[in-house]
Design a protein with these regions (language model features):
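Short linker/helix segments within small regulatory modules
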Residues: 3-13
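Short hydrophobic/aromatic residue motifs in ordered secondary structure
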Residues: 91, 164, 281-282
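Short, amphipathic alpha-helical "recognition" segments used to contact nucleic acids or chromatin
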Residues: 31-47
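Acidic/histidine-rich catalytic cores and adjacent linkers
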Residues: 13, 20, 24-28, 35, ...
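Cys/His/Pro-rich metal-binding microdomains
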Residues: 1, 17
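DNA-recognition alpha helix
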Residues: 48-55, 284
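RNase H-like nuclease fold core
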Residues: 15, 22, 54-152
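Conserved beta-strand -> loop -> alpha-helix junction used to position metal-binding or nucleic-acid-contacting
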Residues: 137-187
Length: 365
């Protein structure tokens, strides 16, 4: 066989040198591989569908890659033990959340769930060896899952998230003097670089509480006798802001990134925020979904899976996930329900036995 030009469809034509017969050869496997690679490349880029393949329309691209959405990528666990792992969840919409583990600049694993809870986090954590320290933003159920799955791992709360939550209670311009003093302590939280500065900050927080304890304990009593609550804290939002800082200080999750014992176990400085996973995973994922907006939820989830798989440390080739059932799915057969033969047991017709349909005589007698 020898190449003998191309057909009108662009396929290479082959001709037999002995008998002169001409034919084309279909390489279905390589074609499927090329189509899936094109889809993944489009998802991970800012190109439009018409720009992926020059000379090909967006409609043709969608038709050729329609089967590719059935292919589900999987991240195989490597068993590598990391010094630091950052955990966070991103919501595509209500009841559809993706839990993500991130370490050393790449995705480690992910898990789909309806909402962040201890069970969902535990499923993800059980597939990853326990690291020396984990950086979290305080998501629902995560602390409980860490206590049961990674009991020896140190926990560092994201200081930016704590600072943001405290500011939500105090606002940017607190009206009371204790509120302004607490806001000043809150702003200084992310600027601490040494253990001495951390100790001074904790002393300042304790001093603030002892100085304004009477202010925090002030109560307002209801004047309406029909009120459901007889009294409430007058400065409830300031109390909540202080309790948030005090709780994390008692738990020891504010300044783990400065502890000498932990720094001796790891090879790189420990992060004090979840900025790496926020900027390295969450922001690009939201940008991808914005660039390729308009997809239905199942395709958005598949797009997220492909992006995460492609940003692992050593992503497997995309064609290794292709199975025959992906591009040749079995046709769905709708079962035919036959009507039962015999008298109706329950129907809409009137019968004498019911007593509420046909009535005879005076007053039904």
């Amino acid at each position: 066989m020898k190449k003998n030009g191309t057909t009108s469809a662009g396929k290479t034509r082959y001709r037999c040198l002995d008998c002169g017969a001409s034919r084309t050869i279909d390489r279905d496997g390589s074609q499927r591989r090329y189509q899936l690679e094109a889809l993944v490349a489009w998802l991970c880029s800012n190109q439009t569908q018409a720009q992926v393949r020059p000379g090909q329309s967006a409609r043709t691209f969608r038709a050729q890659t329609a089967w590719c959405w059935h292919v589900q990528p999987v991240i195989e666990p490597t068993g590598e033990v990391f010094d630091e792992v950052q955990l966070d969840g991103i919501y595509l919409q209500k009841d559809h959340c993706c839990l993500i583990a991130y370490a050393n600049g790449h995705v480690v694993d992910f898990q789909w769930c309806t909402t962040e809870n201890a069970t969902a986090w535990r499923v993800l954590l059980e597939r990853i060896p326990a690291p020396a320290v984990v950086i979290i933003d305080g998501g629902s159920g995560l602390a409980k899952a860490l206590r049961t799955t990674w009991p020896d791992t140190k926990i560092q709360r994201c200081l930016v998230h704590i600072q943001r939550n405290v500011r939500r209670y105090l606002t940017r311009r607190p009206r009371t003097t204790p509120g302004r003093q607490l806001a000043k302590l809150n702003y200084a939280l992310t600027k601490i670089q040494t253990l001495d500065e951390a100790a001074d900050w904790l002393v300042a927080l304790a001093t603030w509480h002892s100085s304004h304890q009477a202010f925090l304990n002030q109560k307002t009593y209801a004047t309406d006798p029909m009120a459901t609550t007889p009294w409430w804290w007058t400065h409830d939002r300031v109390r909540k802001a202080y309790n948030l800082l005090a709780t994390q200080a008692r738990n020891g999750t504010l300044f783990q990134y400065l502890q000498t014992e932990l720094l001796e176990q790891v090879h790189t400085p420990v992060s004090s925020t979840t900025n790496r996973i926020e900027g390295g995973v969450n922001a690009p994922l939201r940008q991808m979904l914005s660039l390729h907006r308009g997809m239905r939820l199942p395709r958005r989830k598949r797009a997220v899976e492909w992006w995460l798989q492609q940003h692992t440390e050593a992503p497997a080739p995309v064609h290794t996930f292709i199975q025959p059932q992906h591009y040749d799915p079995t046709a769905r057969v709708t079962p035919i329900t036959e009507e039962p033969i015999g008298p109706a047991l329950y129907d809409r017709a009137f019968t004498d036995e019911e007593g509420i349909g046909i009535q005879r005589g005076w007053k039904g007698l």
